[in-house]
């Protein structure tokens, strides 16, 4: 087994080359190529994703604009009615019919229910309840000094409300409910106790109660959703309400009821050309009002977790998008409705669409390129590995003796010279052993060269297993070996040589099927500490000279000094 001492002062490039062989270089190159191809593909995916998000927002924005314009049309009518009534409060008309209506009110105000009507063809009737009913709660009051003006303004509102009705409006009912115990509505009420129940229903609704000056300090339009559990889908509605104030006094509320069914029809019409995605309208509490899904199809509703995630995102911006499982949800707040419009796009719709086709093609291209890259990497890696193995084999053959598997003469001298130089600079001991097998020629002559080869291989194995890990050994001649002992003093070298001599002498070798042979070795030792000379060739020559003395003294001996001072060891 060959021993090799690694030099600490090798160049950084050689160390790097030793650490990173051709296989590592191939792996690194292919890894860089795959990384860049993946990054480029990922960049394309991000661009495609941004385009997809922009497409979703554009689809949602077009439908939201149509719905918002329609709601704005209705809100403009409501504000127009409020402004007209406010003008009537400030400057009431001095028509005799209006004055007569005030007189009739004074006569009927104590009744349980009553009705005032000026002209059935041009105005809407006014319905009211008694003073006793109004006095039951602090929310209602007939103590206003402008009660007569409010009454005439409400009658004038009847003209405007009748004229303002249009088939293009989403609203089913427009009404004014006064805190003074009367109301006006575009939907007629049968004369009787229904007037009381209807007025009671109005003044107990959130859209009326929440318009007090304390609860609505901005005095703007507010939206409310009917959330009663017993209300059917056909009866669901949203209500827009607007307070009527003058001189810091709250007179009442103008309101407009819009059926959810009307919103659904309008939403389906607006999204008719958009064959992908589903539109959903939610109120400000994220309660689903309606959707654009066909009647035979179930809507993609949000669960509680998805609703919470969406609510958190809505707090940050007025529009955006969010991936929820296999759905992509884009949302936008409406300008004229206190709620949001959602567009839900499923994974199946995305795959079947244009962006899905592009994504699939991009994925297939990346997969094909990656597969080709991996196959090429495997082929080149295999070729480089074979070349590297061949190179190492040739290099090993160039440095080692094929029979003994120790260093050959050239490699040994090169490595030993570098070691000697290093230990000379460090001023550390350095020793050399020269070894020769005794009577080796007779082994070849008696048993043949194959037996001789077996003896050489056997001796080399014993040498390699006896020396230290950082020592090196090589075959420098026919049956002659050289052992380099860096860091070993002459005494230590003598101990190592003695162990080698004993092991070689103690082991028998099977040279033929029925014949064993015991061999011996003679050795000469030299050390740099003797003369301070670290020149390896000089040390090897001196050890070889002492080897000759050992042989002259009878073989199977070690000579560690000149012939006049040598000590024999058997």
UniProtKB/Swiss-Prot annotation:
Cofactor stoichiometry and binding remark: Binds 1 Mg(2+) ion per monomer.
Protein origin, superkingdom: Bacteria
Subcellular location: Cell inner membrane
Pathway(s) this gene product operates in, as recorded in its UniProt entry: Glycan metabolism; bacterial cellulose biosynthesis; Purine metabolism; 3',5'-cyclic di-GMP biosynthesis
Gene3D superfamilies: 3.30.70.270
Pfam families: CHASE7, GGDEF
Segments forming domain GGDEF: 428-563
GO cellular component assignments: plasma membrane
Keywords attached to this entry: Cell inner membrane, Cell membrane, Cellulose biosynthesis, GTP-binding, Magnesium, Membrane, Metal-binding, Nucleotide-binding, Transferase, Transmembrane, Transmembrane helix
A GO term, aspect molecular function: diguanylate cyclase activity
Marked site positions, Transition state stabilizer: 441
Active-site residues, record numbering mapped to chain: 479 (proton acceptor)
Membrane topology category: Multi-pass membrane protein
Reactions accelerated catalytically: 2 GTP = 3',3'-c-di-GMP + 2 diphosphate
SMART domains in alphabetical order: GGDEF
The keyword Lipid metabolism belongs to this UniProt entry's keyword annotation: no
Listed EC numbers: 2.7.7.65
Cofactor(s) the protein needs: Mg(2+)
Residues where substrate binds: 444, 449, 453
Oligomer status and interactors: Homodimer.
Role of this protein: Catalyzes the synthesis of cyclic-di-GMP (c-di-GMP) via the condensation of 2 GTP molecules. Cyclic-di-GMP is a second messenger which controls cell surface-associated traits in bacteria. Involved in the regulation of cellulose production.
NCBIfam families: GGDEF, PRK15426.1
Protein name: Probable diguanylate cyclase DgcQ
Species this protein is from: Salmonella typhimurium (strain LT2 / SGSC1412 / ATCC 700720)
Organismal lineage: Bacteria, Pseudomonadati, Pseudomonadota, Gammaproteobacteria, Enterobacterales
């Amino acid at each position: 087994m060959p021993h090799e001492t690694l030099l600490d002062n090798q160049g950084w490039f050689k160390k790097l080359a030793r650490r990173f062989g051709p296989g590592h270089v191939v792996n690194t190159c292919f890894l860089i190529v795959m990384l860049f191809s993946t990054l480029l593909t990922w960049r394309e995916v991000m661009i495609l994703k941004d385009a997809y998000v922009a497409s979703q927002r554009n689809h949602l924005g077009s439908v939201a604009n149509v719905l918002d314009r329609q709601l704005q049309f209705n809100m403009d009518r409501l504000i127009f009615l409020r402004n007209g009534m406010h003008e009537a409060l400030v400057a009431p008309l001095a028509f005799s019919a209006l004055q007569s209506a005030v007189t009739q009110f004074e006569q009927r105000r104590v009744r349980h229910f009553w009705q005032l009507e000026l002209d059935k063809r041009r105005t809407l009737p006014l319905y009211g309840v008694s003073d006793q009913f109004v006095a039951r709660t602090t929310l209602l009051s007939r103590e206003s000094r402008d009660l007569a003006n409010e009454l005439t303004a409400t009658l004038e509102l009847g003209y405007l409300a009748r004229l303002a009705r249009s088939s293009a409006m989403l609203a089913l009912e427009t009404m004014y409910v006064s805190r003074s115990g009367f109301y006006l509505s575009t939907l007629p009420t049968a004369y009787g106790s229904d007037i009381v129940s209807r007025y009671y229903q109005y003044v107990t609704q959130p859209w009326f109660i929440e318009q007090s000056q304390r609860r609505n300090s901005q005095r703007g339009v507010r939206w409310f959703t009917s959330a009663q559990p017993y209300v059917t889908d056909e009866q669901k509605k949203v209500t827009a309400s607007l307070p009527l104030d003058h001189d810091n006094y709250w007179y009442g509320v103008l309101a407009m009821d819009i059926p959810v069914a009307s919103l659904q029809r309008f939403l389906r019409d607006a999204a008719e050309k958009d064959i992908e995605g589903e539109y959903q309208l939610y109120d400000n509490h994220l309660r689903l009002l309606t959707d654009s899904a066909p009647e035979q199809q179930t809507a993609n509703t949000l669960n509680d977790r998805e609703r919470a995630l969406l609510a958190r995102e809505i707090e940050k911006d007025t529009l955006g998008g969010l991936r929820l499982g296999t759905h992509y949800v884009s949302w936008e707040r409406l300008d004229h409705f206190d709620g949001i419009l959602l567009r839900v796009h499923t994974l199946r719709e995305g795959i079947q669409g244009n962006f899905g086709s592009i994504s699939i093609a991009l994925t297939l291209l990346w997969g094909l390129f990656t597969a080709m890259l991996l196959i090429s990497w495997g082929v080149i890696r295999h070729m480089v590995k074979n070349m590297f193995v061949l190179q190492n084999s040739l290099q090993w053959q160039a440095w080692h003796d094929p029979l003994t598997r120790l260093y050959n003469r050239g490699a040994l001298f090169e490595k030993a010279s570098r070691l000697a130089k290093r230990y000379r600079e460090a001023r550390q001991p350095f020793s050399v052993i020269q070894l020769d097998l005794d009577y080796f020629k007779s082994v070849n002559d008696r048993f043949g060269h194959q037996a001789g080869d077996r003896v050489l291989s056997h001796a080399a194995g014993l040498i390699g297993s006896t020396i230290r890990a950082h020592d090196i050994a090589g075959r420098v001649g026919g049956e002659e070996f050289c052992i380099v002992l860096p860091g070993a003093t002459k005494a230590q070298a003598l101990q190592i040589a003695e162990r080698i001599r004993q092991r070689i002498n103690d082991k028998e070798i099977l040279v033929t099927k029925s014949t064993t042979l015991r061999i011996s070795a003679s050795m000469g030792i030299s050390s740099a500490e003797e003369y301070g000379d670290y020149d390896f060739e000089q040390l090897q020559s001196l050890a070889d000279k002492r080897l000759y003395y050992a042989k002259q003294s009878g073989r199977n001996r070690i000579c560690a000094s000149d012939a006049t001072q040598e000590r024999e060891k058997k």
